[in-house]
Amino acid sequence: MALPWALAVLSLLPLLHAQDPACANFSTSPITNATLDQLSHKWFFTASAFRNPKYKQLVQHTQAAFFYFTAIKEEDTLLLREYITTNNTCFYNSSIVRVQRENGTLSKHDGIRNSVADLLLLRDPGSFLLVFFAGKEQDKGMSFYTDKPKASPEQLEEFYEALTCLGMNKTEVVYTDWTKDLCEPLEKQHEEERKKEKAES
């Protein structure tokens, strides 16, 4: 089980509608060490909009999700530890996300495919977006992450602005519900195990 990552390499067509001046704010930038520091903590999967049928089905069954990014700067990677509640069951997964610094993308290999997403940092450093298949009308999508379980009105407004720039609308958005999270006990168990390992080392 994994958070929505592209099932194939992202199209290299323009990311968002460049003809709209308001959309100039939503563009990829090179990923720096400061970016990795900003990403290196706990995030909540807050909302998404996908046209790809497989992604759409996946997020519709995702009740709640959160994850941790830990940067390994010298290797240009992020350690991903994710907790997902789907169909009233908690799933845990850990993997490595590779950072393509110059083109502002993140990628993950699942053993079969290399999956790529564009990273969009927002005005609020407590939120960011991943954009998938931007140039493919029937597959494009966007996922929205915040550093708290519930997004602020300002964070949501920026998400909606980016969604419009991608050529999608609010009716396509699927929201998660933190009250349905079942992974918090497992997260606490993992925290205790890490503390014990650290104390013994």
From Swiss-Prot:
Keywords: Acute phase, Disulfide bond, Glycoprotein, Secreted, Signal, Transport. It comes from Oryctolagus cuniculus. Glycans are attached at residues 25, 33, 87, 93, 103, 169. The gene is ORM1. InterPro entries: A1A_glycop, Calycin, Lipocln_cytosolic_FA-bd_dom. CDD domains: lipocalin_AGP-like (cd19451). Disulfide bonds join 90-183. Pfam families: Lipocalin (PF00061). One of its GO terms (cellular component) is extracellular space. Contains a beta-barrel that binds various ligands in its interior. GO terms for biological process: acute-phase response; regulation of immune system process. Belongs to the calycin superfamily. Lipocalin family. It comes from the Eukaryota. Functions as a transport protein in the blood stream. Binds various ligands in the interior of its beta-barrel domain. Appears to function in modulating the activity of the immune system during the acute-phase reaction. This is Alpha-1-acid glycoprotein. Residues 1-18 form the signal peptide. It is found in: Secreted.
